[in-house]
Amino acid sequence: VPQEVMLFGGTISDNIASGNPAASKESIYEAAKKANALEFIESFPETFDTLVGERGVKLSGGQRQRIAIARAILKDPSILILDEATSSLDSESENLVQAALNELMKNRTTIIIAHRLSTIREVDCIYVLEDGEIVEKGSHDELALMEDGLYYNLLYNQLSNA
């Protein structure tokens, strides 16, 4: 799930189903529900048949992210890569997207690329990179206690700027 989601011209249903072209309408619906996308999809008069992309409805960043998450849920990958998946979202959208990501990450290996440390607090293991090298490794709680560590300093700076 990338930072900037690309939707192609077509329906919302088509965009979600690109994760699994053989998917049934029921599985597309369930994926949208798990991705916290159902409420906004059902607010459109044509619901899942609403056109998006260049000639269709303009979706917000959070809505596009949730379509991408629904697509990934439908694809059901064994390894998931999240590249700054919540970085450009407002707080309300971030909470909805984060809840959807938590659902998506269940029972699978997930690699998260993140600068916003609040998005990785609950992960099993954090690898901190500096100049392309791993400089720290541990849980959020472990790294947050290392006062001379890079993670600690990043966390401190983010919390003091919040």
Feature-to-residue mapping (PLM):
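C-terminal portion of ABC ATPase nucleotide-binding domains
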Residues: 34, 43, 99, 116, ...
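ABC ATPase nucleotide-binding domain helical subdomain, centered on the C-loop/LSGGQ "ABC signature"
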Residues: 13-54, 98, 107, 145
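Conserved catalytic loops of ABC-family nucleotide-binding domains
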Residues: 103-112, 120
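Conserved D-loop/post-Walker B switch-helix segment of ABC ATPase nucleotide-binding domains
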Residues: 90-100
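Hydrophobic anchor residue at the start of the ABC signature
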Residues: 69, 113
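A short, proline-enriched helix->beta-strand linker immediately N-terminal to the Walker B motif
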Residues: 74-78, 107
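Catalytic Walker B motif of ABC-type/P-loop ATPase nucleotide-binding domains
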Residues: 80-83
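ABC-fold ATPase nucleotide-binding domain signature/coupling loops
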Residues: 38-67, 89, 160-162
